[in-house]
């Protein structure tokens, strides 16, 4: 997310607060942080695959190797639709990586701007509990991609004789990725293997967040870097809630990280002031840079 996207998202945040009703705060966890027991290598690999979605599509072709993964397929132009790359990875299976906000695209920025909560899309609404709400802009962006993603997953799972599907995203791409991870678990044969999300904004209301926990909580891995402000929007009191168990890298871009159990854990990121720049949102995650359009192209897995 570049500076233009930052400004637009902040303005959208202000407008949403002024225009919309406030909701009672949902529960926030007070559990103490614990050591991260997940394997770190898949985070490192996943970060490189999502960084590559920010690179110019004309600069690489199918067959590109990134760590243990081979690039297979892409859709999206970063404008009308967010870019999505598919890879075949030894550690992750068929990996779906989704680009974050394109700061040079008004359409991409507007996905971040549309804060109003909506019902789940008709494609998957039957699987969601009554009362679940999803941020409109993120759902619009996902719905533009979902049919092509599902077709590609079926094709490459068959061709590669691969049962595992992993969803990866950064920033807006993490929000879209959370919807994709849920949808794949609910509607695709074989379901979801893992999801790795970096700099995740809030996507839905407490009913949605709790359904995420019940459905893919044991498969979801998501991380916040330093004083990144993006995971704090849409604001909690506007009715949005994160799923459980974020990993907080603090100080930002370091190798110091802890897992914060439960939803909206009060002992982690709420304890430090936000920094409204990209130094942490686009930074080093588990030894790999996610730098957006200003990052490393091709991505370098585990280079930091």
Swiss-Prot record:
Pfam families: Lipase_3 (PF01764). Residues 1-19 form the signal peptide. Its EC number is 3.1.1.-. One of its GO terms (cellular component) is extracellular region. One of its GO terms (molecular function) is hydrolase activity. InterPro entries: AB_hydrolase_fold (IPR029058), Fungal_lipase-type (IPR002921), Sec_MonoDiacylglyc_Lipase (IPR051218). It is an enzyme of class 3 (hydrolase). It is found in: Secreted; Secreted, Cell wall. The active site is at residues 171, 228, 281. Keywords: Cell wall, Disulfide bond, Glycoprotein, Hydrolase, Lipid degradation, Lipid metabolism, Secreted, Signal, Virulence. One of its GO terms (biological process) is lipid catabolic process. It catalyses: a monoacylglycerol + H2O = glycerol + a fatty acid + H(+); a diacylglycerol + H2O = a monoacylglycerol + a fatty acid + H(+). This is Secreted mono- and diacylglycerol lipase MDL4. It comes from Malassezia globosa (strain ATCC MYA-4612 / CBS 7966). The lineage of its organism: Eukaryota, Fungi, Dikarya, Basidiomycota, Ustilaginomycotina. The gene is MDL4.
């Amino acid at each position: 997310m570049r500076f233009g996207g930052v400004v637009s998202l902040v303005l959208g945040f202000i407008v949403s607060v002024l225009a919309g009703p406030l909701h009672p705060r949902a529960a926030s966890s007070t559990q103490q942080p614990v050591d991260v027991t997940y394997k770190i290598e898949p985070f490192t690999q996943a970060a490189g695959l999502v960084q590559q979605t920010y690179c110019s599509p004309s600069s690489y072709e199918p067959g590109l190797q990134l760590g243990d993964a081979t690039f297979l397929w892409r859709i999206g132009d970063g404008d009308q639709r967010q870019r999505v790359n598919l890879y075949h990875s030894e550690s992750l299976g068929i990996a779906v990586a989704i680009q974050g906000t394109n700061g040079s695209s008004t359409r991409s920025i507007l996905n971040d701007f549309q804060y109003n909560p909506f019902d789940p899309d008709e494609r998957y609404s039957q699987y969601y509990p009554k009362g679940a709400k999803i941020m409109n802009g993120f759902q619009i962006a996902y719905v533009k991609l979902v049919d092509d993603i599902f077709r590609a997953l079926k094709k490459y799972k068959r061709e590669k004789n691969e049962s595992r599907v992993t969803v990866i995203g950064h920033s807006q791409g993490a929000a879209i990725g959370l919807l994709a991870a849920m949808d794949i678990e609910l509607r695709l044969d074989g379901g979801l293997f893992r999801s790795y999300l970096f700099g995740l904004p809030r996507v839905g209301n407490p009913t949605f967040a709790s359904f995420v926990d019940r459905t893919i909580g044991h498969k979801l891995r998501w991380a916040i870097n330093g004083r990144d402000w993006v995971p704090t929007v849409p604001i909690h009191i506007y009715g949005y809630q994160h799923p459980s168990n974020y990993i907080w890298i603090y100080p930002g871009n370091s190798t110091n990280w802890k897992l914060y159990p439960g939803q909206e854990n009060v002992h982690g990121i709420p304890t430090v002031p936000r920094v409204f720049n990209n130094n942490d949102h686009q930074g080093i995650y588990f030894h790999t840079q996610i730098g957006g359009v200003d990052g490393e192209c091709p991505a370098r897995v585990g280079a930091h």
